[in-house]
Amino acid sequence: MSEVKNGTHVREVTDETFGTEVEAHRGAAIVDLWAEWCGPCRALGPIVDDLAREFEGRVKVAKLDIDNNPVTTARYNVRSIPTLLFFRDGQLVESVVGLRSRNELAARIAKLAA
C-alpha cells in the first residue's frame, strides 16, 4: 500500500504498488520520478506538492524514488530526472523531463484533468 508523504496530498508509490495506485487508477494521475540526490528534483518537489493540493479530487499525484524502484523506472524508460509521467485511465499520455514552471505544469495538469 502506498502512503501519503509527510501529510501532503502526494502518495509515495513503489515498484510493488505502482500497478494498483497508478495503472489501475481510473481518471487522471501524475507521477513525479525523483531521487534524493537530485537538485532539480528537490526544487520541483514543493511545486508538485502545491499542485496536488490545487487539483485534489481531480488528479491523483504520486512520487516514485528511482533509486529504490528500478523496475518501474526502466519500464517507462526514464533516463533523466526529474520526470513527470501523466496518465489517463492507467495509460501513459505524456512525459515531461526536467524542471518546469508551476504555471506550465498547472496548465498541463488542467488539460489532463479535463
Where are the language model's segments positioned?
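Proteins that catalyze or organize thiol-disulfide redox chemistry
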Residues: 1-59, 68-83, 88-114
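Conserved residues in the N-terminal Rossmann fold of short-chain dehydrogenase/reductase
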Residues: 63
